[in-house]
């Protein structure tokens, strides 16, 4: 095995461990919250894309994290955080981290972003988008590399936290093709592969 291969394998193991740890932290927080706050389908989100996401997140999820800081709209209060995250397949294609997004800076340096998503009904959504940035402000800050997308559905009490796309509802071939075409949709493939960055992982 060549030295670059050894280095690459070591980096992938580090990435795998960081993602698995962050996912476990998030999943455990949600499970504890369901024990204390009841059925997740009864949780009430704030209005779609409105202020109050940090207060909501603190009540239902954030208080179970070990954090350095947390903030909502003015992210510079708690970190020199990113305003946007770009795609691995096209670094010029970026997504803004919008207003009304709760940001948690965990004590291991990882970041968790929480914001409403899906199709709102009567001004409210039952879906949250969650981004995990496994190494915070450190580079590369690219989807598929160190930033991964998850969905929290308040309509599904059995499997509320889902990778995107879902690892349990798609074949590996579909997950791989999806990840190859859009680096913001790679968490499903990684969860399917037990959070390992396998040889055919595109990013």
Kindly give the residue locations of the regions a language model identified:
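Amphipathic alpha-helical segments typified by the pilin-like N-terminal helix
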Residues: 1-30
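Alpha-helix exit/C-cap motif
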Residues: 27-46
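Intrinsically disordered, low-complexity regions enriched in Pro/Ser/Thr/Gly and acidic residues
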Residues: 49-203
